[in-house]
């Protein structure tokens, strides 16, 4: 058997083997715990895609322009998870943790943004999920207390 036939045979065996392997599980972007359905809800990109998406252009305290964010409303995420509580403890990849009143998510159109200026957010640029308040739509949101609630690299919400 010549070298070409051996390479073709190896490629065919590899393709058959790899084709029979189960697809890798989709990565979890956000985990909700506490007062949610069954005590734990893990959201993948497919879960986010199943919800209504919204766009929001607003200034931030960490950008030099007014970015346009795209994502899902925080209140829709809470509803999807069957959350019942008065606050969430938001936790980020960088170990930042802050308590946020759930009332914020009903009083304002707060986004769980996955895109900024049309580009998917990654952990290197505040993603994969960034809590974004509609700062320019409500004067009160310019207060530093709200700036502390803009959690980037969001990975978990504990509903209490």
What do these predicted ranges mean?
Residues 2-11:
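Bacterial N-terminal signal peptides that target proteins for export
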Residues 10-20:
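Bacterial N-terminal signal peptides
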Residues 24-160:
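N-terminal intrinsically disordered, low-complexity segments enriched in P/E/S/T
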């Amino acid at each position: 058997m010549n070298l070409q036939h051996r390479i073709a045979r190896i490629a065919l065996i590899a393709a058959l083997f790899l084709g029979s392997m189960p697809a890798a599980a989709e990565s979890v972007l956000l985990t909700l715990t506490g007062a949610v359905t069954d005590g734990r809800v893990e959201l993948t990109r497919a879960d986010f895609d199943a919800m209504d998406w919204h766009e929001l252009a607003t200034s931030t305290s960490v950008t030099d322009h007014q970015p346009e964010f795209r994502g899902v409303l925080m209140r829709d995420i809470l509803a999807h998870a069957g959350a019942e509580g008065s606050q969430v403890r938001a936790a980020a990849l960088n170990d930042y943790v802050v308590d946020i009143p759930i009332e914020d998510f009903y009083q304002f159109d707060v986004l769980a943004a996955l895109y900024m200026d049309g580009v998917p957010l990654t952990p290197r640029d505040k993603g994969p999920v960034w809590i974004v308040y509609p700062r320019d739509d409500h004067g009160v949101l310019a207060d530093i207390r709200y700036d502390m609630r803009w959690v980037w690299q969001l990975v978990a919400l504990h509903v209490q």
